[in-house]
Amino acid sequence: TNSKNSLTVAAVLGVSNYTGPESVSTTSFSNYGPTDDGRIKPDIATKGQAVISTESTGDSDYASKSGTSMAAPGITGVVLLLQEHNYNINSSYLKSASVKGLLAHTADECDTNFFGADGPDYKYGWGLVNAERAATCIMNNGVTSLIYEGTLNEGESYELNLEALEGEELIATISWSDPMGEVYNSSVENMRDYREPVLVNDLDLRVSNSTL
């Protein structure tokens, strides 16, 4: 079902000092979305160019390598550290959907020239991973941030009332694990550019000002 619950990683050039979206540039080999049914992929971006990795020519050899296969392990490492951080604080692990939402929520904006607008796009997903900001979000949960994990049945809604501080950003992110959709027994040719939605659950997030 087009990796709807997985983390798909874009490979970008290394960023030594992030100062804004213009600090991030994609690599020539990193593919981009959308999925056939229009969903955003990839989900997150990290360095995938000239990454020092192990080399099979010897037992202790390393080499500089590039590819999304170098970017994805970087995100895997970030996720493991965040899970360890959450366990050290809360004695529990985050659900997979929470991890995905946390990475999206705390990512840095990437180059906007490709699509001409801020926000998630089909080239970088929700942006450049920011592990420090994600860890801070976990550490400050219930104080300056809130990570809520729950279950919604069909037709249900969840409402949260909070007070935003003047001059401070209010950012909200929703993420969920979607169940398996319909399996199509069709040829590869017929499935190419198949536009039927693969999402089983389509959840919406709404933010409103109760004082207006």
Predicted regions mapped to residue ranges:
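Catalytic-core segments of hydrolase enzymes
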Residues: 1-53, 104-107, 171-179
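Extracellular hydrolytic enzyme modules, especially secreted metalloproteases
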Residues: 4-17, 27, 95-101, 105-134
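Short consensus segments that form the blades of beta-propeller domains
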Residues: 18, 90-92, 192-198
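Extracytoplasmic/secreted cell-surface and envelope-processing proteins
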Residues: 18-20, 60, 113, 182
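Hydrolase catalytic cores
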Residues: 45-114
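Solvent-exposed strand-loop boundary residues in beta-sheet-rich modules
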Residues: 57, 209-211
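Secreted peptidase-domain scaffold signal
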Residues: 120-201
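Beta-strand signatures of extracellular beta-sandwich domains
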Residues: 204-208
